[in-house]
Amino acid sequence: MVNYPHQLKGKKANPTPFKTKKSTVDFANRGMSFEAAINATNDYYLSRGIAVIHKKPTPIQIVKVDYPKRSRAKIVEAYFRQASTTDYSGVYKGLYIDFEAKETRQKTAMPMKNFHLHQIEHMASVLDQKGICFVLLHFSTLKETYYLPAKALIDFFQIDKGNKSMPLDYIKKNGYEIIQGAFPQVPYLDIIEQNFLGGDYN
């Protein structure tokens, strides 16, 4: 039985969506990938003392190592291993932040093949410890980005494991659209503040 954080107990994931003026800024038009935009956002938060959130390194399986010199080793063959948890983690206002980021070119749904059981289990464990856990979902063709609480993702995964994709309508109903900005590009802390903490990080 997963005990979700107190911020999510007894309330729908999207009771009063936080709305801001629609921005015309699009990080893709500036030659940035979704991941790069998130990293730039985290750098912005860090440089201003707002939050400390970093991308977790991708685990690597080393297969072959050469030793051209006794004092120097050279990796000549290695493979990326499947990540065991999520993409990002850190601290904001004393709260543990943990999230995954996914992107798709589809217009109506997010492929569930992008999520693995061990990631779902990790998110549930974070919620058990009262952490703030969520996924950032970017629809590149639509140029839309959403914050979906981990609870909503876990519920969908548990109820409809055989479904090949999560409908955009479900994401809109249970999540929050993130309005892209110039600085930061993906202001996801705005969603946390306005909908879960009820404050302002500025």
UniProtKB/Swiss-Prot annotation:
Presence of keyword Cytoplasm: yes
Subcellular location: Cytoplasm
InterPro entries: Resolv_RecU (IPR004612), Restrct_endonuc-II-like (IPR011335), tRNA_endonuc-like_dom_sf (IPR011856)
Cofactor remark: Binds 1 Mg(2+) ion per subunit.
Residues binding Mg(2+): T85, D87, E100, Q119
One biological process term in Gene Ontology: chromosome segregation
Enzyme class: hydrolase
Record keywords, A-Z: Cytoplasm, DNA damage, DNA recombination, DNA repair, Endonuclease, Hydrolase, Magnesium, Metal-binding, Nuclease
Reactions this protein catalyses: Endonucleolytic cleavage at a junction such as a reciprocal single-stranded crossover between two homologous DNA duplexes (Holliday junction)
GO cellular component labels: cytoplasm
EC number: 3.1.21.10
Function: Endonuclease that resolves Holliday junction intermediates in genetic recombination. Cleaves mobile four-strand junctions by introducing symmetrical nicks in paired strands. Promotes annealing of linear ssDNA with homologous dsDNA. Required for DNA repair, homologous recombination and chromosome segregation.
GO molecular function: endonuclease activity; magnesium ion binding; nucleic acid binding
Organism ancestry: Bacteria, Bacillati, Bacillota, Bacilli, Lactobacillales
Organism: Streptococcus uberis (strain ATCC BAA-854 / 0140J)
Pfam families: RecU
Family that this chain belongs to: Belongs to the RecU family.
Cofactor(s) listed: Mg(2+)
Domain of life according to the entry: Bacteria
Gene giving rise to this polypeptide: recU
Protein name stated in the entry: Holliday junction resolvase RecU
Residues of the site described as Transition state stabilizer: K102
